[in-house]
Amino acid sequence: MTEKRNIFLIGPMGAGKSTIGRHLAQQLSMEFYDSDQEIEKRTGVDVSWIFDIEGELGFRKREQKIISEIIDKRGIVLSTGGGSILSREIRNKLSSRGVVIYLETSVEKQLVRTKKNKQRPLLQVDNTSIQTVLEELAFHRNPLYQSIADITIRMNDRSIKAIVFYIIRLLNNF
C-alpha cells in the first residue's frame, strides 16, 4: 500500500471494529475515527440517549451525515457503526472512497463481547433474547457487509496484534 488510502471497517457490533481500527491506524500512522464516538462527541450525548429520544431513524440520519463528512478526508481509518451499511448511500460512498474491510464474526462471539455492555441500544430488548436479536441482525446485514467488502477477515481467537498485521499484509498486496 504505497499511498495512504482510506480504510473502512464494517461489521456487526462486537466484531472488534473500534479496537482493530485504533491499532491499525496507529501501525499505519493514519488518523482514526469511530463513527459512534464522533456522533457522541458532536452531540454531547451517548448513542443510547439519541436512540431513546430520536429513535433509530434519527440516529441513522446523524450517522449518515457524520460518515459522509469523515470519508471525505484522506488517509484515515474509520470504524463504522454496525447498522451504517443499511444506507445504500453510505455503502456506495464507502465502496468508492477506500478499502472496505469486513470484520466477520459469529453470533456466539458477539454474545460474549456484548453481554456486559448495557450501552448498545439495539440490545435493549424485553421479551426477545439478545441472541435472537443478533441472529436477526446478522440475517439482514451480513449480505450487505459482504456486498461491499474488498477484504473479509474472519474474527477468531487470534490476538489483536496478529489480526492487525494480517490486515496490513493483505493491504500491501491489495
UniProtKB/Swiss-Prot annotation:
PROSITE patterns recorded: SHIKIMATE_KINASE
GO molecular function, one term: ATP binding
Needed co-factor(s): Mg(2+)
Residues annotated as binding substrate: D36, R60, G82, R141
Annotated GO biological process: amino acid biosynthetic process; aromatic amino acid family biosynthetic process; chorismate biosynthetic process
Main location: cytoplasm
Top-level taxon of the source organism: Bacteria
InterPro entries, per the entry: P-loop_NTPase, Shikimate/glucono_kinase, Shikimate_kinase/TSH1, Shikimate_kinase_CS
GO CC annotations on file: cytosol
Protein localization: Cytoplasm
Gene3D superfamilies: P-loop containing nucleotide triphosphate hydrolases
Keyword Nucleotide-binding: yes
Binding positions for ATP per the UniProt entry: G14, A15, G16, K17, S18, T19, R120, R158
Pathway: Metabolic intermediate biosynthesis; chorismate biosynthesis; chorismate from D-erythrose 4-phosphate and phosphoenolpyruvate: step 5/7
Reactions catalysed according to its record: shikimate + ATP = 3-phosphoshikimate + ADP + H(+)
Keywords on record: Amino-acid biosynthesis, Aromatic amino acid biosynthesis, ATP-binding, Cytoplasm, Kinase, Magnesium, Metal-binding, Nucleotide-binding, Transferase
Residues that coordinate or bind Mg(2+): S18
Cofactor annotation remark: Binds 1 Mg(2+) ion per subunit.
Record EC number: 2.7.1.71
Function: Catalyzes the specific phosphorylation of the 3-hydroxyl group of shikimic acid using ATP as a cosubstrate.
PANTHER family per the UniProt record, alphabetical: SHIKIMATE KINASE, SHIKIMATE KINASE 1, CHLOROPLASTIC
NCBIfam families tied to this protein: PRK05057.1
Assembly with partners or alone: Monomer.
HAMAP family, A to Z: Shikimate_kinase (MF_00109)
Family statement: Belongs to the shikimate kinase family.
Protein name per Swiss-Prot or TrEMBL: Shikimate kinase
